[in-house]
Regions:
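N-terminal leader/signal peptides at the extreme start of proteins
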Residues: 1-15
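Short, well-structured segments within or immediately adjacent to enzyme catalytic domains
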Residues: 50-315
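Intrinsically disordered, low-complexity repeat segments enriched in small/polar residues
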Residues: 6-7, 19, 104
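N-terminal single-pass transmembrane signal-anchor helix
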Residues: 12-46
Length: 315
């Protein structure tokens, strides 16, 4: 009987403190190995989803272009000078990114959710949840929700309903040649935003929130969409795929980015290039443009002195 009792006591014996500590140490070790891998997998998933959203936005523009002889959507062509729908001069004052995305949202070419990156880190960038479709009344010369509290916003200093930078919409050579369905695989049209004025050194680079969107925290990473609707992921504001400027002499670009007399293009900066008279606005540029550079409704079709510095918000 005594032997049976001792046997039962041995069978009911639990883990010792040492054994529990060993198990906990093993679990901690496994978590230490798995968590970085899980974090990397989640970051990769966000980057891929972000890439898909950039592609969808541009596809929406291309679909809209089918109704406009191949011209990508331009707010000033949707809401023209005068009150007759579809007629009149282009209203250049309307041409900013808030109106661009607001008009596409109002016409159903995009939805509010895909306008904000899944990797967004700026608290001022949020989906437009208040857009009022009932405000759209073409008969009253209203083509998107213009409401101060409900309409689509694109101002990183106050509130932006989009994460993505886009080609400026001002009347320049750039717009004349590329704001249409060109299928140009070397012209950047849309993508993740970058450091202020294309900075690659100094505080404007190292302190930029855009370094935190993808990849690590020390260098810029992002998805860039081209006018043929292909997307590339890279770690430089000088993508090799982007067509370089004509010559290096008047480009203002870093000397180490001059290759065979061609200056590589910074997609977050309005590079000069060697155009006649030192004109700008022929290269790929991606910004978030809060207002038009025009103070009047009509403007020249080749406003190539435009710099954009007063009409763009950063971070």
């Amino acid at each position: 009987m005594r032997n049976t009792h001792m046997k039962n006591r041995n069978q009911n014996k639990g883990f010792t403190l040492v054994e529990l500590l060993v198990v906990m140490a093993i679990i901690a070790l496994l978590l230490g190995l798995l968590l970085p891998a899980l974090a990397k997998a989640r970051a990769t998933a966000r980057q891929v989803k972000d890439q898909t959203q950039v592609k969808q936005i541009h596809q929406g523009w291309l679909t809209a272009a089918n109704d406009s002889q191949g011209i990508l959507p331009l707010p000033g062509e949707i809401n023209r000078v005068g009150a007759v729908p579809g007629r009149g001069d282009i209203d250049e004052i309307q041409n900013n990114h808030g109106n661009l995305h607001g008009s596409m949202l109002g016409r159903g070419y995009v939805n509010a959710q895909i306008m904000v990156s899944p990797a967004e880190i700026n608290a001022k960038v949020i989906p437009c949840a208040t857009y009022n479709m009932n405000m759209i009344k073409p008969a009253s010369d209203v083509y998107w929700d213009p409401g101060a509290g409900t309409g689509f916003k694109a101002d990183l200093l106050i509130q932006s309903n989009t994460s993505y930078s886009t080609m400026p919409l001002d009347p320049t050579t750039r717009r004349k040649t590329e704001w249409k369905n060109t299928s140009n695989s070397r012209f950047a049209i849309l993508g993740n935003r970058g450091p202020k004025a294309g900075a690659v050194t100094g505080d404007d680079y190292t302190n930029s929130k855009t370094l935190l969107i993808h990849g690590g925290t020390k260098e810029w990473d992002g998805n860039i969409g081209y006018n043929d609707n292909h997307i590339e992921y890279g770690r430089t504001s000088y993508p090799e795929n982007v067509k370089p400027l004509a010559q290096a002499a008047c480009s203002g670009g870093p000397a180490d980015l001059v290759i065979s007399t061609l200056s590589q293009d910074n997609i977050f900066k309005n590079d000069t290039g060697c155009q006649t008279g030192g004109k700008k606005n022929v290269d790929s540029v991606l910004w978030i443009q809060k207002t038009s550079s025009n103070t009047t409704s009509t403007g020249t079709t080749t406003l190539d002195i435009y710099s954009g510095s007063d009409f763009v918000t950063w971070d």
